[in-house]
């Protein structure tokens, strides 16, 4: 409201100055002749009114643009009403939907019940507090860690290595009742090295958090031990949580544990770790029978509700159990509606029954995995089969449920003008999505999610429909989806403030179309029914991309949102493209034509046109068909993007290669532009962008442009490496160059699995269809596939992680880890599923 008032006052002031000038001119004209002065005054009055209305009209349009940017799209949801509720989808209601913590579960709800695990090794470093582990971090020294098995639904087993400890976290869900069923955890702590003479003293912290008016009632046992926690929420009904006494691993023999408890108001989800740390300040003695006592730091030990907060703030209840490794502890959630009418003693999912359930689920996972991907049948080694299982499990175990409001800068239609506005809150929305990395990117990314779902849909098409439906639910009234979804306090706490805001003028590669293509080709009734519901939103999303990112000439496209040409940047980044620092035109301008975006739009027009025809959407088909035909017409791409002097496709823009970073004390490294100066030309940056017509299979097998692209791809001076295709030619001036003094190369030579997957899919295609390059494509396919699979396997065996990217020089994993987002595509590469 205040911003609108200032604009109105500014518009009024701008309208007053021409009026004063008009009056002055009228007086001068009046001395020459009254009639002429009257006529001139009238004419000027008309001009003034027109100007005022013009300014007013622009303000109204800007105001409407802001409103549309912050308004959800009116099209019907692609998912059924209340699709996340236990009544509609009970099998998905509970899950490991907290990817940023080492182990935890929550309900798929805006106000969830959350459970989680923290742990600490007591006395590991005398005189210092124990290191409390909770959230996945890059630099906390924990690792490797990750899911050995996870079926995305009801079962998982994870191993975590932390110094001298190995933790195994397992869970099983059991259906029943009306509120999502029951679940049981088993956490096993063992020394990493066998035959360890001294077993470490370890504390586990099991906690429950509510987020509002929900009820938690702990039942007190002896010496700080909770018998159980009773609770009630509107979505779960009545329930009970029980922490069983610790036992020897693989046995039912009980072990002596020491107990502490803490109960408080919910401090806010990002502050749970800090609250436990701050209260872990009292010394206690662990006294097993027949053994010497050992000191440990514990929680206060009382069951009074500490630091009671405002009504509706929620509760935070922690049970600490401390003992010497090795041991196992089980934590059980029982739904009241599932328990009704059941013999609790015989039916509780604990002990031997839990062991049998875990073994049964593990066997079922392995059998289903082989049935789905057939790695053993296709001759892959046991190590490669295990890698495939880990890749799938890590991706499924990283699926999260998020709810909240993002920060958005509306699109005013004038580039750069959004910098003068304050961001606004988008409406509260849910998101069910995979994440690229639990430690570094534990939230939804639009460009990544399409690749994630290529893997997920082979395993569980229902999960993919849920994820795509949620992403399409983020559409604003214009058809825009923010490229990074930072929803809720937990997600926001892990992102620097300068990266929280999403700009409604900026796009992202429409990779959600990739799983849509698979759905369209498979023609499963459930998928086609989903696509019918989703089509209005898919169409709106594509239309926004096609219109908002239009380039300077017909059928050209340009990523909005390139960085400004600051003196510290070697080459202004293009974050919306997903390829961040990949070299583009040295001097950003409205004259740019971006090859990769043109290819994405061509693919989108093709897919949406085919989908409209399949669904009988005649009006949309009449619009999309001609657009697809124009974009795919012979010579259309050549005319805008073929660079004869480079022998490949390329971006076009205001460019010179005579740029470099030089030291200029005291500023540090600054960009220096030499000669020749920038001019409109094709951009000489040979790399992933150059391959996009090949990657997205937009070229006919007989195209004269296919051969040169295959030659460049196969040339070790350019893109070929023993570990996969590098992102930028080794001959490029930008190869492995920093973009700023503090910004190391990212898409400037490293090997990325998502693009290598697209390349393998294209080579597989062109190696199977008749054409002059069939033999060459097939040979390159076999060699590239072997290189990629071998390197990812070797790096996993050496480090225990899948990585964000891999070195083109020695194959080592680089970037963040674990990265079981699109690096999980190694599974589809092994299975030859494209």
Swiss-Prot record:
Pathway: Glycan metabolism; N-glycan degradation. It holds the Pfam family Glyco_hydro_63. It catalyses: N(4)-(alpha-D-Glc-(1->2)-alpha-D-Glc-(1->3)-alpha-D-Glc-(1->3)-alpha-D-Man-(1->2)-alpha-D-Man-(1->2)-alpha-D-Man-(1->3)-[alpha-D-Man-(1->2)-alpha-D-Man-(1->3)-[alpha-D-Man-(1->2)-alpha-D-Man-(1->6)]-alpha-D-Man-(1->6)]-beta-D-Man-(1->4)-beta-D-GlcNAc-(1->4)-beta-D-GlcNAc)-L-asparaginyl-[protein] + H2O = N(4)-(alpha-D-Glc-(1->3)-alpha-D-Glc-(1->3)-alpha-D-Man-(1->2)-alpha-D-Man-(1->2)-alpha-D-Man-(1->3)-[alpha-D-Man-(1->2)-alpha-D-Man-(1->3)-[alpha-D-Man-(1->2)-alpha-D-Man-(1->6)]-alpha-D-Man-(1->6)]-beta-D-Man-(1->4)-beta-D-GlcNAc-(1->4)-beta-D-GlcNAc)-L-asparaginyl-[protein] + beta-D-glucose. The keyword Aminoacyl-tRNA synthetase does not apply. The chain crosses the membrane at residues 37-57. GO terms for molecular function: Glc3Man9GlcNAc2 oligosaccharide glucosidase activity. Keywords: Endoplasmic reticulum, Glycoprotein, Glycosidase, Hydrolase, Membrane, Signal-anchor, Transmembrane, Transmembrane helix. Residues 1-10 have a biased composition (Basic residues). It is found in: Endoplasmic reticulum membrane. It is a single-pass type II membrane protein. GO terms for biological process: oligosaccharide metabolic process; protein N-linked glycosylation. InterPro entries: 6-hairpin_glycosidase_sf (IPR008928), 6hp_glycosidase-like_sf (IPR012341), Glyco_hydro_63_C (IPR031335), Glyco_hydro_63N (IPR031631), Glyco_hydro_63N_sf (IPR038518), Glycoside_hydrolase_63 (IPR004888). Residues 74-136 are annotated as: Required for endoplasmic reticulum targeting. GO terms for cellular component: endoplasmic reticulum membrane. A motif (Endoplasmic reticulum targeting) lies at residues 3-9. Residues 1-36 are cytoplasmic. In the context of N-glycan degradation, cleaves the distal alpha 1,2-linked glucose residue from the Glc(3)Man(9)GlcNAc(2) oligosaccharide precursor in a highly specific manner. Belongs to the glycosyl hydrolase 63 family. This is Mannosyl-oligosaccharide glucosidase. It comes from Rattus norvegicus (Rat).
């Amino acid at each position: 409201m205040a911003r609108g008032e200032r604009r109105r006052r500014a518009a009024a002031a701008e309208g007053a100055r021409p009026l004063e000038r008009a009056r002055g001119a009228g007086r001068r004209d009046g001395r020459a002749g009254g009639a002429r002065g009257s006529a001139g005054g009238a004419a000027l009055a008309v001009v003034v009114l027109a100007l005022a209305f013009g300014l007013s009209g622009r303000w109204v349009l800007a105001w409407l643009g802001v409103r549309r940017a912050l308004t959800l799209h009116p099209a019907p949801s692609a998912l059924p009403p209340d699709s996340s509720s236990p009544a509609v989808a009970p099998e998905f209601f509970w899950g490991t939907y907290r990817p940023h913590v080492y182990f935890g579960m929550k309900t798929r709800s805006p106000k969830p019940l959350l459970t989680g695990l923290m742990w600490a090794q007591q006395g590991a470093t005398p005189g210092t507090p124990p290191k409390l582990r909770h959230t996945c971090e890059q630099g906390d020294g924990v690792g490797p860690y990750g899911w050995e098995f996870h079926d995305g639904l009801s079962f998982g087993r994870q191993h975590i290595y932390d110094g001298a400890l190995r933790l195994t976290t397992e869970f099983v869900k059991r259906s029943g009742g009306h509120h999502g069923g029951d679940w049981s955890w088993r956490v096993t702590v063992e020394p990493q090295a066998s035959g360890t003479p001294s077993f470490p003293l370890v504390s586990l912290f099991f906690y429950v958090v509510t987020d509002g008016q929900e009820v938690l009632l702990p039942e007190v046992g002896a010496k700080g031990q909770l018998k159980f926690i009773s609770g009630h929420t509107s979505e779960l009904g009545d329930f009970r949580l029980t922490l069983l006494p610790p036992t020897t691993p693989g046995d039912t023999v009980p072990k002596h544990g020491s107990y502490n408890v803490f109960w408080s108001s919910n401090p806010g989800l990002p502050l749970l770790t800090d609250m436990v740390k701050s209260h872990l300040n009292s010394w206690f003695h662990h006294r097993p029978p027949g053994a010497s006592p050992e000191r440990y730091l514990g929680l206060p030990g009382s069951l009074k509700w500490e630091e009671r907060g405002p009504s509706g703030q929620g509760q935070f209840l922690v049970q600490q159990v401390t003992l010497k490794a090795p041991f196992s502890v089980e934590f059980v959630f029982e739904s009241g509606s599932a328990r009704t009418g059941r013999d609790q003693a015989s039916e509780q999912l604990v002990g031997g029954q839990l062991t049998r359930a875990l073994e049964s689920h593990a066997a079922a996972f392995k059998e289903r995995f082989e049935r789905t991907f057939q790695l053993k049948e296709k001759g892959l080694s046991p190590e490669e089969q295990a890698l495939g299982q880990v890749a799938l499990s890590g991706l499924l175990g990283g699926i999260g449920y998020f709810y909240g409001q993002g920060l958005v800068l509306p699109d005013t239609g004038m580039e750069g003008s959004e910098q003068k506005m304050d961001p606004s809150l988008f409406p509260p929305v849910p998101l069910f999505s995979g994440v690229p990395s639990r430690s570094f990117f534990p939230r939804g990314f639009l460009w990544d999610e399409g690749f994630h779902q290529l893997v997920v849909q082979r395993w569980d098409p229902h999960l993919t429909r849920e994820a795509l439906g949620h992403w399409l639910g983020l559409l604003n009234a214009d058809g825009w989806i923010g490229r990074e979804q930072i929803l809720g306090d937990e997600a926001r706490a892990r992102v620097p403030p300068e990266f929280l805001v999403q700009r409604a003028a900026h796009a992202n590669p429409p990779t959600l179309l990739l799983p849509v293509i698979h759905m369209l080709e498979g023609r499963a009734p459930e998928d086609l029914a989903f696509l019918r519901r989703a089509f209005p939103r898919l169409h709106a999303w594509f239309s926004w991309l096609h219109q908002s990112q239009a380039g300077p000439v017909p059928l050209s496209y340009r990523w909005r949102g390139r960085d400004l040409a600051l003196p510290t940047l070697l080459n202004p980044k293009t974050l919306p493209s997903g390829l961040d620092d990949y070299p583009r035109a040295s001097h950003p301008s409205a004259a740019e034509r971006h090859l990769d975006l043109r290819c994405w739009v061509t693919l989108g027009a093709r897919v949406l046109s085919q989908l409209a025809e399949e669904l009988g959407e005649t009006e949309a088909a009449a619009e999309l068909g001609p657009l697809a035909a124009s974009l795919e017409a012979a010579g259309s791409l050549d005319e805008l993007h073929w660079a004869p002097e480079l022998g490949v496709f390329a971006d076009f823009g205001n460019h010179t290669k005579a740029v470099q970073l030089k030291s200029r004390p005291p500023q540090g490294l600054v960009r220096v532009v030499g000669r020749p100066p920038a001019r409109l030309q094709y951009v000489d940056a040979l790399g992933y962008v150059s391959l996009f017509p090949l990657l997205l299979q937009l070229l006919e097998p007989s195209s004269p442009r296919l051969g040169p692209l295959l030659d460049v791809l196969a040339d070790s001076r350019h893109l070929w490496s023993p570990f996969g295709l590098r992102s930028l030619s080794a001959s490029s001036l930008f190869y492995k160059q920093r973009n700023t003094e503090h910004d190391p190369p990212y898409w400037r030579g490293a090997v990325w699995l998502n693009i290598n997957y697209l390349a393998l899919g294209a080579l597989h295609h062109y190696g199977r269809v008749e054409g002059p390059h069939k033999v060459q494509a097939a040979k390159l396919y076999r060699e590239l596939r072997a290189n990629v699979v071998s390197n990812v396997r070797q790096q996993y065996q050496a480090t225990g992680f899948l990585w964000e990217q891999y070195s083109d020089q020695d194959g080592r994993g680089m970037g963040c880890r674990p990265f079981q987002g699109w690096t999980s595509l190694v599974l589809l590469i092994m299975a030859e599923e494209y």
